[in-house]
Amino acid sequence: MIIIGLIGRIGAGKSTVAARFAAHGGHVIDADRIAHEVLEEPDVIRQVANRFGADVLDVDGRIRRRDVADRVFGPTPDHARALEWLESLVHPRVRSRINAEMVALEARDEGRIPPERGTVVVLDVPLLVQAGWADRCDRLIVVNCSEEVRRQRLAARHWNPAQQEAREAAWDRNYSAAMLPSEKLSSVDASGDLAYTHSQVDLIWSGLSG
């Protein structure tokens, strides 16, 4: 099994790169998708409602993520404490699910004859380095994007300024490119030309070996 980790700011184009790997047969583990699933767990719903109030739930009793985001992303100490609490609730569950998925994939690979390269796993995890996933990866791909294009993508998400600033600050916290082992690094430019972005991913894929 080969594990590839994607690194990049919000709006850089990590999902586009992940989708191209998936088109080649890579197995993408999308932490955002898993986090959304975690927020549907009854115990998590109960704790979130207790912390933020029942008005963050819709008529079906599901968490309205945008309402929760308003409470955890912002400039005040209360926002910071709320975000820390939410992360302490959600992140361990997300990590557990990712680990379980990777264990299952590795077990499946062990039964292959011949083993060949095995599954290529792509970790699409926000704050991959800051969350400690980089050490698990065989390859790290930094997804770059022009600031102008990235800002356009973020505008399309309709986050309020406080939410965007808090998410950007989360990236800046405890991150330095110097932390990354150069022997694992590749980069992809995802500034806009989809065919060009795909061609870079294709080249990386063709060079993978087990």
Kindly label every feature range from the protein language model:
Residues 9, 21:
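P-loop (Walker A) phosphate-binding loop of NTP-binding proteins
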Residues 134-136, 155-210:
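Small-molecule kinase domains that catalyze NTP-dependent phosphoryl transfer to phosphate-bearing small molecules
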Residues 6:
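Hydrophobic anchor at the beta1->P-loop junction of P-loop NTPases
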Residues 15:
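Walker A/P-loop
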Residues 12:
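ATP-binding Walker
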Residues 36-119:
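ATP-dependent small-molecule kinase phosphotransfer cores
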Residues 99-107, 111-155:
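ATP-dependent NMP and nucleoside kinases share a basic, alpha-helical "lid"
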